[in-house]
């Protein structure tokens, strides 16, 4: 609106690829009533205007297409050749209507703009390639071997789908996947929250630049979450390999199990609850690591600035290096059943009352406690090195 005023014209003047125009010019929308079409195995949708895109299961065993698209953009091209359905609307005549606060998916007349493609339930598409410039994308009850969905400004929702490979790319919008089964799933999000619920399969990767990531009640071979700025919530996950890399944000992980568990957090609190893995590695640069009911054979924990509470329901080997913060170890059995090496440069050491203190040493402010390897503690070891902070050992 400010553009028109600055140019000395009427408010609402906008720049487009075709020049300077008024958004109040309205062309008749392009319409295609719901129409049955021939079967197809490949799908290509390109929407350069404002519209919602829906790909969903039909109620019968037939294929259909329908749309209403903004007449101020280029004329849509709809083709079905050699088993491939292609629908495209370029923005040759398009106005930047999103700058004026219009609702997502509405054209200048206020009428809802959309494309809906219907596919028989259970059909497996070979490929699906979808791009939507400004609007939501909903993929529901449709299967595909190779699926790629890109939304520049809008939400993407996946429901009850099976796929060999699925890639979601979002610039500005939320992503949601429910009851998705995939061999390979990749989600790249610039701005927006991402939610995975009841997903299953092999390799799942989520990369989020700015926005939270939530997963719940899922089972995969591997799950990798990479975040720049946003909180993480993982609840109910079975994965052979779990990897979390977080730069800024809190992480809450509960009811997860598998073989290899890795968390790297640069700035934020890490909460672990009911975690069962064979090997665990946790690195926190700035933030507390607070845990309860942890079961693992090998644990490697590194902290720079923050406290550690490690509540072990099962523990065979633990290595902990802390730079500045308190360490609280809650062990499942007596300290004497481990080979022990505790070292504190500046801080106090607190041990259970019944622990033999003959290996306790204090010299020049440094505190150490050791229990040598023996048949009694064969194969089990606890090593803690803390530069500045207290160390407390207690039992569950």
Each model region followed by its residue ranges:
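Short linear S-[DN]-x-LW-Φ motif typified by the pepsin-like aspartic protease active-site region
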Residues: 5-92, 96, 105-131, 136-150, ...
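An anionic, turn-rich surface loop/hairpin at beta-sheet edges
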Residues: 95-107, 358-366
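Short, surface-exposed interaction patches in beta-rich subdomains
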Residues: 159-161, 166, 175-189, 193-396
């Amino acid at each position: 609106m400010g553009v028109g005023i600055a140019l000395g014209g009427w408010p609402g003047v906008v720049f487009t690829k075709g020049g300077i125009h008024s958004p109040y010019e309205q062309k008749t929308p392009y319409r295609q009533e719901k129409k049955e079409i021939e079967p197809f195995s490949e799908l290509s949708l390109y929407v350069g205007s404002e519209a919602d895109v829906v790909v969903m299961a039909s109620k019968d065993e037939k294929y259909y297409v329908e749309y209403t698209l903004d007449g101020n953009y280029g004329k849509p091209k709809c083709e079905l050749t050699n088993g491939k359905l292609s629908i495209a609307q370029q923005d040759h005549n398009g106005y930047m209507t999103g700058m004026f606060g219009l609702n997502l998916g509405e054209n200048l007349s206020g009428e809802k703009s959309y494309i809906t493609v219907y596919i028989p339930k259970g059909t497996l598409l070979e490929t699906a390639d979808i791009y939507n410039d400004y609007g939501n994308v909903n993929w529901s009850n449709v299967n595909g071997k190779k699926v790629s969905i890109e939304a520049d400004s809008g939400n993407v929702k996946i429901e009850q789908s099976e796929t060999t490979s699925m890639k979601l790319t979002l610039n500005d919008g939320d992503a949601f996947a429910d009851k998705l089964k995939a061999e390979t799933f990749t989600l790249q999000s610039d701005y927006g929250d991402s939610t995975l619920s009841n997903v299953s399969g092999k390799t799942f990767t989520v990369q989020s630049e700015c926005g939270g990531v939530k997963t719940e009640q899922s089972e995969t071979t591997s799950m990798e979450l990479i975040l720049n700025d946003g909180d993480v919530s993982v609840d109910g996950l079975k994965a052979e390999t779990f990897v979390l890399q977080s730069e800024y944000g809190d992480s809450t992980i509960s009811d997860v199990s598998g073989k290899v568990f890795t968390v790297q957090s640069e700035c934020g609190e890490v909460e672990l609850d009911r975690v069962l893995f064979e090997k665990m590695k946790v690195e926190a640069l700035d933030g507390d690591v607070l845990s309860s009911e942890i079961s693992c054979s090998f644990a490697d924990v590194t902290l720079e600035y923050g406290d550690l509470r490690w509540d072990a329901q099962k523990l065979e080997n633990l290595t902990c290096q802390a730079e500045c913060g308190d360490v609280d170890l809650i062990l499942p059995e007596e300290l004497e059943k481990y080979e022990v090496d505790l070292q504190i440069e500046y801080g106090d050491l607190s041990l259970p009352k019944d622990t033999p203190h003959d290996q306790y040493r204090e010299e020049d402010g440094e505190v150490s406690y050791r229990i040598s390897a023996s048949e009694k503690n064969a194969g089990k070891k606890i090593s803690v090195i803390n530069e500045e902070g207290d160390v407390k050992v207690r039992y569950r």
